[in-house]
Design a protein with these regions (language model features):
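Sequence/fold signature of self-assembling virion shell proteins
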Residues: 1-14, 131-158, 166, 186, ...
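Assembly/oligomerization interface modules of large self-assembling protein complexes
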Residues: 2-77
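Non-transmembrane, amphipathic alpha-helical segments
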Residues: 51-55, 84-87, 91, 275
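Short helix/loop capping segments that flank catalytic or ligand/cofactor-binding pockets
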Residues: 74, 108, 199-201
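Alpha-helical scaffold segments that mediate packing/assembly in large oligomeric complexes
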Residues: 80-171, 320-329
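Generic, well-ordered alpha-helical scaffold segments in large soluble proteins
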Residues: 102, 106, 175-178, 203, ...
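C-terminal amphipathic alpha-helical
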Residues: 103, 107, 187, 191-192
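Amphipathic interfacial helices
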Residues: 173-177, 181-191
Length: 330
């Protein structure tokens, strides 16, 4: 179950750090320190970066199964009445094949991107994963409003969801070339949603046709022309107009300093097997000055949350054959 920290797709683009409840990086950059020699003490060099406090969040898992319920399913071969419910192969199977994937989906689709922390009013209420922590998009939206995190925000940011393919190509190209000169030599990702990625690729193809007119094999691929920056889709950004770019070392996934086992207890209550688990997880950015982002005014990450990243385009039916979320005019 420790795979929860590397099993969700965005994890590989982040740098893991450990802390108890909060993490704050040490300032690591200063203004110019070299000067002409003189025989007098004339100190120079002030800390330049704004270290951002990253909040760690404690999450829990309460999940119950009744192993006997699988008696009429294809999982019957994993049901062994000679064993106690918590020792049955079916119990372990459900942890690895059902519980863990569900945790990873919650993390990717509801928590690390669009999550917005909301404290429970009543501890007995069933919590929602999207209210258990602040995600990347929420952090950027709130920082754009407060203006106190030192982040480089693209001025007059455009909502690229309504832009044409050609406009997306032009916008991202300008975004990439406006990143400060000291970062232009670094190989970094420009993170965006799958929808914006497709718009960029279609617009690029329409502009250049079959080729870009150059022998450089990077042209026409995911690298933005004449830069060291490559487009990278994050699943957690589904339906989002936000794009951002930062070194991997600045993109933080926070764990607990003394991380416990995720599944902390398994209890038998009559025929039911109950799983108790907990883990810590937070996300954020170490330094605002190392982050470049385009965040359009009025965007609400929570409004786009869904279990699977879907929109209202598809008609969905439930087990009773009833249509859910029908498309308007369909």
């Amino acid at each position: 179950m420790q795979d929860i920290y590397r099993g969700f797709t965005t994890a590989k683009f982040m740098t893991p750090k450990r802390a108890i409840e909060t993490y704050k990086a040490v300032r690591s950059d200063y203004t110019s320190v070299v000067q002409e020699f003189s025989a007098k003490w004339t100190p120079s060099g002030d800390a330049r970066f704004t270290a951002i406090k990253i909040q760690n969040y404690r999450h829990k898992i309460n999940f119950a199964i009744v192993p006997a319920d699988v008696a009429n399913s294809w999982l019957l071969s994993l049901y062994n009445e000679r064993l106690s419910p918590d020792q049955m192969p079916i119990t372990r199977y459900i942890v690895q094949k059902i519980l863990l994937p569900s945790i990873l989906q919650d993390i990717e689709m509801k928590m690390i991107g669009k999550g917005k922390y909301k404290a429970k009013e009543n501890p007995t209420d069933v919590g929602k994963p999207e209210e258990s922590m602040n995600g990347i998009e929420t952090l950027l939206v709130e920082a754009a409003k407060s203006g106190d995190k030192g982040i480089n925000f693209y001025p007059n940011a455009k909502d690229l969801r309504t832009a044409t393919d050609a406009e997306v190509v032009e916008y991202i190209d300008d975004f990439a070339h406006k990143i400060l000169a000291k970062y232009q030599s670094l190989k970094m990702n420009i993170f965006l949603s799958a929808d914006l990625y497709v718009k960029y690729k279609r617009g690029y193809k329409d502009k250049w046709g079959a080729g870009s007119g150059t022998e450089n094999p990077d042209f026409g691929k995911d690298r933005v022309d004449f830069t060291n920056f490559s487009l990278q889709v994050l699943d957690c950004l589904y339906g989002s107009p936000i794009i951002f770019c930062t070194p991997k070392s600045n993109f933080i996934m926070l764990q607990n300093l003394n991380q416990p086992q995720v599944i902390t207890d398994i209890q038998k209550v009559d025929y039911e097997v109950r799983y108790y688990g907990e883990f810590w997880l937070g996300v954020g950015f170490a330094f605002g000055e190392m982050l470049f982002a385009s965040v359009p005014t009025g965007y609400d990450p929570q409004a786009a949350i869904s279990d699977d990243g879907s929109t209202d385009f598809w008609k969905k039916t439930n087990t009773a054959g009833e249509v859910e979320n029908p498309t308007e005019g369909a």
